[in-house]
Amino acid sequence: NYITFAFLSLLILLASSCSKESFDFSSIHARFFYDNSIHQDATLQSALNPMSPGVFCRIYEGNEGSSLFFYFESNQNMKTKQKATADDLRPTRILGILPKTGIIVGYGNLSYPATLYCYDSQCPNCYAETNMANYKLTIASNGIASCTKCKREYDLNNNGLCANGKKLIKYRATCTGPLGVLSVNN
């Protein structure tokens, strides 16, 4: 009897812990921690404000000389860059499938309270077909991300959905406010 009770209890616990949301995120690793209270980057700040949903920011990294920079581009035509500090370099960074194209973060405008989304900046359909990370999405002011190769469009405000293919690769993200810490940890 005790073994049956323990087994049923475990089964109920496991069944209740597997929410639909837990399957919504990619199994691809992504890791990024950025303290915007130190950098005060206006482009990132605009995307991390839940009171201005629909603003999205691409974050990617690149080198200028021997220095690493983080680049921020919003769908509202803002572009900034910040030189990485020693504290930025300490934790392991995995900015999506390809760090040179990065991730896209922002609050969707279709729910209240607004939902923070974090997507890979690669077209998931082209990436799945070729297994190559050569398909950086463009992001428009209306919150639509487009692939120039396959012409598919993805709704950044609506969980990265696509009318005719896979939805965007989605990562877990939290933030403590526009001038707080952005944490992507998948």
Regions found by a protein language model. Give the residues of each.
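Iron-sulfur (Fe-S) cluster-binding segments and ferredoxin-like electron-carrier domains
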Residues: 132, 154-159
